[in-house]
């Protein structure tokens, strides 16, 4: 899967939102990033990890939540960054369901 394909999935979902500058309190024109594959540690089993596509960073300083896309399950999920490492904290399904779960 490519970054462009993932962006297409997100853009299709965002058609349902009347104002992408204020979706659940976030300006998505500022918080969405070019999908980037990154290493995520399993928050329950800190010995295992997988590579997932980061698509949104809640804060510019990377201290908040992130939203990722899992190309194997075709689902979006939440992660957090601590000590310069990303941790997967769960899949929520669609991009918007994940965003509303933050």
Language-model segment annotations:
Residues 1-46:
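N-terminal domain-onset segments
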Residues 20-30, 65-67, 76-80:
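Generic preference for hydrophobic/aromatic residues in regular secondary structure cores
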Residues 21-22, 57, 94:
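General structural signal for secondary-structure boundaries
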Residues 29-73:
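Amphipathic, interaction-prone secondary-structure segments
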Residues 71-102:
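A short, surface-exposed interaction/processing loop segment used at functional sites
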């Amino acid at each position: 899967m490519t970054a462009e394909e993932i962006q297409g999935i997100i853009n299709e979902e965002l058609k349902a939102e009347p104002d992408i500058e204020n979706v659940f309190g976030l300006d998505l024109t500022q918080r969405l990033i070019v999908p980037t594959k990154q290493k995520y540690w399993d928050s329950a089993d800190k010995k295992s990890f997988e590579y997932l596509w980061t698509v949104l960073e809640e804060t510019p300083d990377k201290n908040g939540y992130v939203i990722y896309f899992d190309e194997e399950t075709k689902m979006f999920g939440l992660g957090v960054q601590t000590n310069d490492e990303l941790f997967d904290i769960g899949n929520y399904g669609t991009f918007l369901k994940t965003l509303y779960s933050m």
